[in-house]
Structures are given as C-alpha cells and as structure tokens.
Amino acid sequence: KGKTAILIDDMIDTGGTICSGANLLKKEGAKRIFACASHAVFSPPSYERLSSKDLFEQVIVTNSIPVIDNYDFPQLKVLSVANMLGEAIWRIHEESSVSSMFR
C-alpha cells in the first residue's frame, strides 16, 4: 500500500496480462504503477486498455517492433534500441564480444 509498482514483461500484445496485474496492484493500494516491456506488439484492444488515464503513470516500451504513428497516448514512452542493435551488429561483424556490452 502506498508504494510505486513496476510491472515488467517481455512484450505487450493485447495488454490483458499487464492490465490485470495493474488492476490487482491498484486494488491492493499501489500509489503509482509503471509498465515496461521490450516488445510493443500492441494488438487490439491494447490501446483502450493501456491508455486508461487512471491505471498507469507510464507505459515504457522499446521500438524493437515499430509503434504505429497514431498509437500515442500521454503515458506512452518509446525508447530506441537503434544504437544498441547497431553496436551489436558491428561487434558481430568485427568478431568481437557482444556480451561485453552488457557488463
């Protein structure tokens, strides 16, 4: 109760799982709820579920899957993975360590 909750998942597709978790946390008294996922599949009806103004303080995803232009709401933050992927490709080409990027 009264705490900040961070929900982390590998992907958000319809938003059902992450919204169910957020609703439970809200019911238990979470003060703020953040959702984070690597891949934003965003199939219908995810927009309606995620953009609810009273559920998430912020929904944070990467652009590993392009987020369509008209899929925008105030709580959505899309982080670019372009530099990291470019660096990984370069290291593979140069036959150097990719794992050292994450140490």
Model-derived features: positions:
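PRPP-associated nucleotide enzymes
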Residues: 1-103
